[in-house]
Amino acid sequence: GSRLIFQTRREGVPCDQIYTMALDGTNVQMVSTGDGRTTCGYFFPGGESILYASTHLGGAECPPEPGFEQGYVWAVYDSYDIFTANADGSGLTRITDTDGYDAEATIGPDGRVVFTSVRDGDMEIYSMNGDGSDLRRLTNRQGPDGGPFFSPDGSKIVFRGREIPDGPEFDDYKRLLNQGLWRPTELEIFVMNADGSD
């Protein structure tokens, strides 16, 4: 393509937003709403439409950054949903609509979307069509699975994760997740088939 998509916090905009620009760095345009916090912007194949996650339906303000009273933690904002839009930001459409964190979405070469969600009470990986249809849960184990990416041919998904057995560490993980937080600890890299097998 002829444009890049990226997230950044610019002067006058309090939270990260999604922008596009020409390959030479000119013609920078905000393509997200300017409200809430956004993450993980991608072009669909062909470059005519984009995908990103945003908290803007939960409020125009930035969601609060986590404090570190509980150690080093990351926010897992339950107001994140996944959206598609035309490449210029028009035609914004919400494609996830369940309670809880839906973010970290990426796109395969065929336009299928893979993402992280806590819709079932744990950080798991799901896939869906670019319009939100044909939702499939791909992982099912205790502990955080996320950050999925398709292989170049779309046949595999690589992701970070960790299975946490019952016990104090899992209890801490669930307690934090119920507060919209996650403590990234030891994680491993996994590869599975695009349908969640192997």
Regions found by a protein language model. Name each.
Residues 7-18, 32-38, 53-82, 96-102, ...:
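A flexible loop/linker signature enriched in serine peptidases of the S9 family
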Residues 22-26, 86-90, 129-133, 193-197:
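Short loop/turn segments that connect beta-strands within beta-propeller blades
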Residues 146, 156-157:
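Conserved active-site beta-strand-loop modules that form the wall/rim of enzyme catalytic pockets
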